[in-house]
Amino acid sequence: MTYDEFKSSSRFAPEELIAFAYGILVDDPPAGFTARLPAPPFLMLDRILEISVNGRQGRIIAVQEIRMDAWYFQCHMPADPVQPGCLGVDAIWQLLGFYCAWRGGLGSGRALGCGEVAFNGQIRPFNRLVRYEVDVRRFTHLKESGASIVIGEGRLFVDNEEIAEVHEARTGLFKGIAYPDYPRRSANSVGGRLDK
């Protein structure tokens, strides 16, 4: 799809999310369009059902189909398989990073933190569907640095029961931090603080 088609799409299919993860979804990306989603198996989304904007705010609804043989059930935990709650938090960050790119942000995505996280349920192998609902509270493009920042409130549902909330989740896109020549040593092969 073209970059304009990407920015005007209101939903994304599984193959489109995987193509985005590998950097091949957009045929004519602008310079600096280095945002990616994690590739499977760490991609925690199967479909984006809705992505919309209303001024500096917006909304994202996405789903993940639960697979009995998912990698995390094999190791977390033996004789008591449950999807780690932190993966649900990461799914919210994944969605917010995608939202930044969809809004025209350039650079590579990084989770920046969140406020309170509350879990009141669990995801087991025989559950069927996780739904993520994110209310974007604010999207900002910082002209001086070229970074884009988004803040959202996330809720997780499993089979239509709410099981978690993630408050003040923050993600940003930052220019000049991509590491496309991995595993070679290069300017971005070592991490550290992003504000240097």
Task: Show which residues each predicted segment covers.
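Compact, glycine-rich, soluble single-domain proteins
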Residues: 79-81, 92-95
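Active-site beta-strand/loop microenvironment that shapes enzyme catalytic pockets
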Residues: 89
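Short connector loops at helix/strand junctions that flank enzyme active sites
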Residues: 43, 112-114, 129
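Conserved short alpha-helical segments that host acidic/polar catalytic motifs at enzyme active sites
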Residues: 94-103, 107-118
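A structural-propensity feature for long, helix-poor, extended segments
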Residues: 117-136
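Non-catalytic linker/capping segments at the edges of enzyme domains
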Residues: 1-82, 102, 107, 123-124, ...
